[in-house]
């Protein structure tokens, strides 16, 4: 019987070829790592939440009671809650009732959480000084857009957040 014997051998890899391959691989990893956030920035976020929305929760994850909320807060207060996708979201109290909208508390400039300033009746970003009116409309600073709106409805004794549908009433 005849055996087929292959005399093919790979040529030995020189140091130069090995170092070039390692350097190219390293540069490729760095370039891909640097491009990922850039590409992610240009892809719009999904709407999040479901059609039914999400019950607003306090910092401990307990549903917020509307009756308790209105009894313990001023008639024009803004109360921080966990909103859609876990983002900090303000429940807006206007004239002693829960408004039909809430405000995402994340600054549109660089993503800081914007606290409500009761004394000045506005939101002030501690990072770069952006200021927002009581309805979330940007009034000063580097922030490019107003705070994002979410729909807020009273469901029994709870506040339910859902994605905002329709035009921004603050722009009219």
Swiss-Prot record:
It comes from Synechococcus sp. (strain JA-2-3B'a(2-13)). Its main location: membrane. The 4 large subunits of the cytochrome b6-f complex are cytochrome b6, subunit IV (17 kDa polypeptide, PetD), cytochrome f and the Rieske protein, while the 4 small subunits are PetG, PetL, PetM and PetN. The complex functions as a dimer. One of its GO terms (molecular function) is 2 iron, 2 sulfur cluster binding. It is found in: Cellular thylakoid membrane. InterPro entries: Cyt_b6_f_Rieske (IPR023960), Rieske_2Fe-2S (IPR017941), Rieske_2Fe-2S_sf (IPR036922), Rieske_Fe-S_prot (IPR014349), Rieske_Fe-S_prot_C (IPR005805). This is Cytochrome b6-f complex iron-sulfur subunit. The Rieske iron-sulfur protein is a high potential 2Fe-2S protein. It catalyses: 2 oxidized [plastocyanin] + a plastoquinol + 2 H(+)(in) = 2 reduced [plastocyanin] + a plastoquinone + 4 H(+)(out). The gene is petC.
């Amino acid at each position: 019987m005849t055996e087929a014997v292959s005399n093919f051998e790979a040529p030995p890899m020189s140091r130069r070829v090995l170092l070039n391959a390692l350097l190219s691989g390293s540069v490729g990893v760095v370039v891909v790592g640097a491009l990922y956030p850039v590409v992610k920035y240009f892809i719009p976020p999904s709407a999040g939440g479901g059609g039914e929305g999400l019950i607003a929760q306090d910092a401990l994850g307990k549903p917020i009671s509307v009756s308790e909320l209105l009894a313990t807060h001023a008639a024009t207060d803004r109360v921080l809650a966990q909103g859609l996708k876990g983002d900090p979201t303000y429940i807006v109290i206007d004239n002693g009732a829960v408004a039909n909208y809430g405000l995402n508390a994340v600054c549109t400039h660089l993503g800081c959480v914007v606290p409500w300033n009761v004394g000045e009746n506005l939101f002030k970003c501690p990072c770069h000084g952006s200021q927002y009116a009581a309805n979330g409309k940007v009034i000063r600073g580097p922030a490019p857009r107003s705070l994002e709106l979410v729909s807020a409805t009273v469901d029994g004794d709870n506040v339910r957040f859902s994605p905002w549908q329709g035009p921004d009433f603050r722009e009219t």
